[in-house]
Design a protein with these regions (language model features):
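Short, small/polar-rich loop/turn modules that mediate ligand/substrate recognition or access, typified
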Residues: 139, 179, 184, 241-243
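Substrate-binding pocket helix/loop in short-chain dehydrogenase/reductase
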Residues: 102-104, 108-116, 211
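Short C-terminal tail/terminal secondary-structure segment
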Residues: 2-5, 101, 152, 230-231, ...
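Alpha-helical segment proximal to the catalytic Tyr-Lys
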Residues: 132, 176-180, 239
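Conserved glycine-rich cofactor-binding loop
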Residues: 12, 19-21, 43
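Active-site helix of classical SDR
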Residues: 127, 163, 171
Length: 256
């Protein structure tokens, strides 16, 4: 029994923003643990490369283009998954955007609206569109990738932080609403991870050294650090966990 705690065999996972970074690592990890994976992002060619990598390792996956800012595109993502694999067991809402760096008082309305739409509303849409299918799974789950930015005030990233705090509340509310359908809903709040999305932070030597010195584990994170948590939250090992956002930040939030 214990050897199967983390297996996802014959289950189907949708991962958004899966062409690179955390999303790619999550897609690869789900496939390595037996899931059939739908790899989605706006870049179909990049998604196909992830599918090819999964296939080369003996896994099964399919690529499709999806724009999280458009509800009809997400409807097509759900339809594609059902047409290709016939079921949905796990949804990982990883895709997000941050088009603005600076104080909230200076953010243009269109940039703020984009953040709210792509980081909050899209996750609501995906959960709503997929839940009636995930409810048919004996072990259905939804995971929303948030950020430790949603736990505290963050200079320069205020709008992004607001959206990520909202994602944590979305996790709590969805867990209550979907629990009776045997769907677990959880979040992951990464710290600084070495991805293109966060390159402006970790590629700055001064910022990176400050972060590493302040972090108990003395390093920034890797996409694989987050991928393992996503497998855990989809697997039997987390069967009694819902409504929680797991912090994966090397311990930096406990240092003040």
């Amino acid at each position: 029994m214990h050897s199967n705690f983390f297996r996802l065999d014959q289950q189907v996972s949708i991962v958004t923003g899966a062409s690179r970074g955390i999303g790619k690592a999550i897609a690869l990890a789900h496939a390595q643990y037996g899931a059939h994976v739908v790899v989605s992002s706006r870049n179909l060619d990049a998604c196909q490369k992830v599918v090819d990598e999964i296939s080369s390792q003996g896994g099964r996956a399919a690529a499709t283009e999806a724009n999280i800012s458009k509800k009809d595109s997400l409807e097509s993502l759900i339809d594609f998954t059902l047409d290709r694999f016939g079921q949905i067991d796990h949804l990982v809402c990883n895709a997000a955007s941050n088009p603005f760096y600076g104080p909230l008082s200076e953010i243009p309305d269109d940039a703020f609206e984009k953040i709210l739409k792509n980081n909050i509303l899209s996750n609501h849409w995906l959960a709503s569109l997929s839940s009636r299918h995930i409810s048919k799974s004996p072990s259905g789950s939804i995971v929303i990738v948030s950020s430790i930015a949603g736990l505290k005030g963050t200079p320069g990233l205020g709008a992004y932080a607001v959206s990520k705090a909202a994602d944590m509340q979305l996790v709590r509310n969805l867990s209550i609403e979907l629990g009776s359908q045997n769907i677990r809903v959880n979040g992951i709040a990464p710290g600084l991870i070495k991805t293109d999305f966060a390159k402006a932070l970790w590629d700055n030597e001064e910022i990176r050294r400050h972060y590493e010195n302040k972090t108990p584990l003395k390093r920034i994170g890797s996409p694989e650090d987050i991928a393992g948590i996503s497998v855990f939250l989809a697997s039997k090992a987390s069967a009694y966990i819902t409504g929680q956002t797991l912090i994966a930040d090397g311990g930096i939030t406990i240092t003040g």
